[in-house]
Amino acid sequence: MNPAHEPLPLEFYNKPTIELARSLLGCLLVKETEEGPASGYIVETEAYKGPGDRAAHSYGNRRTKRTEIMYREAGVVYTYTMHTHTLINVVSGGADEPEAVLIRALEPHEGLALMEKRRSGKKPRDWTNGPGKLTKALSITMNDYGRPLTGPPLYIAKGYEPQDILSGPRIGIDNSGEAREYPWRFWIKGNRYVSR
């Protein structure tokens, strides 16, 4: 672990999900592997507010093998696959409050050669500018499901304070009724790595 990248304490995650989605912007997501570390600053997130949010996997208190981790305490990893992509979420809420924040995009920081190799043939801007892209670039897999984010090999460290945060509707949730209009997607204004 790079001593400059001290993992954020568990207390950091103990805040309302919308607030956490905003607070994660500018933080550094780090994944250590045998090949070396790779990291990026979080520049885009989406909040999912559990049982009352039709876009959340836990809508209506659906408790399945896949969503079980969402019912734990905040500050652990919820990974799932969509098509051929693994996506990473930060579990929020508290025990039995199944909420999460999807990490949608990163600005590459460390391990650029590793990211280039893992995202072979892609332009640097396309390494991490989407939720399925960033997990490939950092080698985040389903094996990371349930990991605490408070220490290696996968953790979040303090980064920088964004100057300007924008919000709007979440992406790719067209079948979720009124929930598709909730302004629970957050991004750093002007950052070229934001997905759209």
UniProtKB/Swiss-Prot annotation:
<keyword id="KW-0234">DNA repair</keyword>
<dbReference type="InterPro" id="IPR003180">
    <property type="entry name" value="MPG"/>
</dbReference>
<dbReference type="GO" id="GO:0006284">
    <property type="term" value="P:base-excision repair"/>
</dbReference>
<keyword id="KW-0378">Hydrolase</keyword>
<dbReference type="Pfam" id="PF02245">
    <property type="entry name" value="Pur_DNA_glyco"/>
</dbReference>
<dbReference type="GO" id="GO:0003677">
    <property type="term" value="F:DNA binding"/>
</dbReference>
<dbReference type="InterPro" id="IPR011034">
    <property type="entry name" value="Formyl_transferase-like_C_sf"/>
</dbReference>
<dbReference type="InterPro" id="IPR036995">
    <property type="entry name" value="MPG_sf"/>
</dbReference>
<protein>
    <recommendedName>
        <fullName>Putative 3-methyladenine DNA glycosylase</fullName>
        <ecNumber>3.2.2.-</ecNumber>
    </recommendedName>
</protein>
<keyword id="KW-0227">DNA damage</keyword>
<comment type="similarity">
    <text>Belongs to the DNA glycosylase MPG family.</text>
</comment>
<dbReference type="GO" id="GO:0003905">
    <property type="term" value="F:alkylbase DNA N-glycosylase activity"/>
</dbReference>
